[in-house]
């Protein structure tokens, strides 16, 4: 009978261990991970890249600093220019704080201009090397997703080519 009386005591003692903050039981989340330098722009081919979004940005419109003129220029794809097909990749939304119209992909090894196609719609954009293994997927910018009409939550299959 006395043993039954001790069961709640042991159960509550176990709860206390579970309620300790993470810093008391192990390293902080993300410890050992070096974040990218804040305010360091990604390499770009655009001589006049869009400005970074405001620090307090919370909405899609606040994060998307690419001008309507830049989006229209991206859609002006020359259908007569010869292209080299690089293949297809699955693309998800990349860091929304990185402005511009770009695709980070393992299909290229150097920064270059290319054409990305999604459901019959083409857009010129920067192809940035992701450093990933072939088949590892790609990240696409917020502005590029909006330009191509890709829903922001979609894992989109896109075709990639270079001129």
List each model region and its residues.
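C-terminal motif of bacterial Sec signal peptides marking the signal peptidase cleavage site
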Residues: 11-14
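Long, compositionally biased stretches
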Residues: 16-133, 151-163
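Sec-dependent signal peptide recognition
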Residues: 1-8
């Amino acid at each position: 009978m006395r043993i039954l009386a001790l069961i709640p005591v042991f159960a509550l003692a176990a709860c206390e261990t579970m309620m300790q903050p993470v810093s008391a039981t192990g390293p902080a989340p993300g410890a050992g991970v070096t974040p990218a330098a804040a305010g360091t722009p990604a390499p770009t081919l655009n001589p006049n890249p869009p400005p970074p979004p405001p620090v307090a940005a919370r909405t899609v419109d606040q994060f998307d600093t690419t001008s309507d003129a830049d989006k229209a220029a991206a859609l002006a794809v020359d259908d007569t220019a010869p292209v080299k097909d690089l293949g297809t990749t699955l693309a998800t939304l990349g860091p929304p704080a990185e402005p511009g119209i770009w695709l980070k992909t393992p299909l290229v090894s150097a920064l270059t201009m290319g054409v990305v196609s999604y459901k019959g719609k083409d857009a010129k954009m920067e192809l940035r090397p992701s450093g990933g293994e072939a088949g590892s997927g790609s990240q696409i910018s917020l502005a590029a997703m909006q330009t191509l009409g890709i829903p922001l939550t979609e894992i989109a299959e896109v075709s990639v080519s270079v001129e």
